Amino acid sequence: MASRQPEVPALEASAPLGKMSLPIGIYRRAVSYDDTLEDPAPMTPPPSDMGSVPWKPVIPERKYQHLAKVEEGEASLPSPAMTLSSAIDSVDKVPVVKAKATHVIMNSLITKQTQESIQHFERQAGLRDAGYTPHKGLTTEETKYLRVAEALHKLKLQSGEVTKEERQPASAQSTPSTTPHSSPKQRPRGWFTSGSSTALPGPNPSTMDSGSGDKDRNLSDKWSLFGPRSLQKYDSGSFATQAYRGAQKPSPLELIRAQANRMAEDPAALKPPKMDIPVMEGKKQPPRAHNLKPRDLNVLTPTGF
């Protein structure tokens, strides 16, 4: 490294080599270590006056510093003789600002990609035909994406699972509906079978049983705001047909009562049938004696004999 000698000779050359002297007026040429590494010439030993040379850390010009200065609007390039403190400050400032910006950009990109994938899936699954009202935790950008729960709720409303007020007049229709969800609502029955029909709105309260009392009368008055339904009567012989009110399932109490009546009428009908197991009768056969002949002993005899 003869070419790397100091350009100005040392003023205090009498200083010992072991001590680091601080000579006045010595300016060492700033050496970039990146250039040294890229130099194809072989490395030579250091100069002999090593102790008289004041070594300073050389900070190479980095690309990200240049980019940061351009982004901030500084057109001037950083000089090679940049001080250590300014370089450390710029190194500390730049990654923090760039990391924050990268964090925000990546978050927005991930959110957008997730929403697009959800939208694509819902479009494929056929769930895009229902409206969606967001709660206050969602942003305005996320409100346009539809959700599965709202579509299911809309399907339930279409299939007939309506509220109680809408279900009550639908129970008095003359023909049963095709969907099982909109069938007439099951009503609690009273103790008497004739009292269950009085809960329906009808023009003839004289058929009410005395056991139902004023409760059923109040019920018929309550639901009379939907309009009293007149029963259609036809002259078809000696009986009149009433409108079909829907199949009424028997209550568990009536099932228990009917089963008790059946047991009282015919107790043998509910007993389990007897199984006729044939018993093997006869004498026990004595164990048969072995009929071994002398030629069979060859099979039973071990080979060692």
Curated annotation (Swiss-Prot):
Sorted UniProt keywords: Cytoplasm, NADP, Oxidoreductase, Phosphoprotein
Region forming the signal peptide: none
Comp. bias intervals (Polar residues): 193-210
Region (Disordered): 37-56, 158-236, 259-305
Motif Flavin-containing monooxygenase motif: positions: 67-77
Subunit structure: Interacts with NELFB, NOL12 and PRNP.
Sequence ranges of Low complexity compositional bias: 169-183
Major location (coarse): cytoplasm
Family, similarity comment: Belongs to the P33MONOX family.
Protein name per its UniProtKB record: Putative monooxygenase p33MONOX
Sequence positions bearing Phosphothreonine: 44, 175
Function: Potential NADPH-dependent oxidoreductase. May be involved in the regulation of neuronal survival, differentiation and axonal outgrowth.
Cellular component, GO annotation: cytoplasm; mitochondrion
Subcellular location: Cytoplasm
Modified residues (Phosphoserine): 182-183
Tissue-specificity statement: Down-regulated in the occipital lobe of an early stage Alzheimer disease patients.
Entry EC no(s): 1.-.-.-
An example molecular function term from Gene Ontology annotations: oxidoreductase activity
Broad class of enzyme this protein falls into: oxidoreductase
